[in-house]
């Protein structure tokens, strides 16, 4: 049950890779680039041209050597464009894989409802048998680990992994924005849950949690 989504994702990723690559290269005769990608490649091209011009001004190379350098710049541009094209293929591949895996996992959770009920009852019994002190300590440890002052780097790694898993190109600004807002939202939801649910179900647990938190 735990490794089932990962296995399905891996199988579909390998199975769909060749099909998605062939479909993209067949249906798109021209390379598709976003404005940001075009600007990035153009800036790289200008940078290489300026380096070539500077090198040509400083050193007196024969024409054959300059021609070789220009061919090298052309090959580098082709490599960058191919790399961007592969990024689009990976985006479609990962997005399709995740959607299919979600549908399969959702169907499995519905069809295997009996097994999930058994697992849920076992977890509830296990948590019920724990003392309030252990529960409060576990909650405090989990909250400090997930939304404490030392957790932003962990959130950054996790969000970057999810971002990459869906096939999107890494964007530091978006990741930084999610890291600065998502833990705050999660902290607010958790405090509301403590106030509404735990205060009604187990007031002693809330008292112990507040004492340990202070």
UniProtKB/Swiss-Prot annotation:
Subcellular localization(s) per the UniProt record: Plastid, Chloroplast inner membrane
Membrane topology: Multi-pass membrane protein
Keywords for the protein's UniProt record, in alphabetical order: Antiport, Chloroplast, Hydrogen ion transport, Ion transport, Membrane, Plastid, Plastid inner membrane, Potassium, Potassium transport, Transmembrane, Transmembrane helix, Transport
Catalytic activity: K(+)(in) + H(+)(out) = K(+)(out) + H(+)(in)
Sequence intervals crossing the membrane: 92-112, 174-194
GO cellular component: a single term: chloroplast inner membrane
Main location: plastid
BP GO annotations: potassium ion transport
Coiled-coil residues: none
Alphabetical list of Pfam families matching this protein: CemA (PF03040)
Keyword Transferase: no
GO molecular function: antiporter activity; proton transmembrane transporter activity
Similarity comment: family membership: Belongs to the CemA family.
Function: Contributes to K(+)/H(+) antiport activity by supporting proton efflux to control proton extrusion and homeostasis in chloroplasts in a light-dependent manner to modulate photosynthesis. Prevents excessive induction of non-photochemical quenching (NPQ) under continuous-light conditions. Indirectly promotes efficient inorganic carbon uptake into chloroplasts.
PANTHER family noted in UniProt: CHLOROPLAST ENVELOPE MEMBRANE PROTEIN, CHLOROPLAST ENVELOPE MEMBRANE PROTEIN-RELATED
Protein name (Swiss-Prot/TrEMBL): Potassium/proton antiporter CemA
Source organism of this protein record: Oenothera argillicola
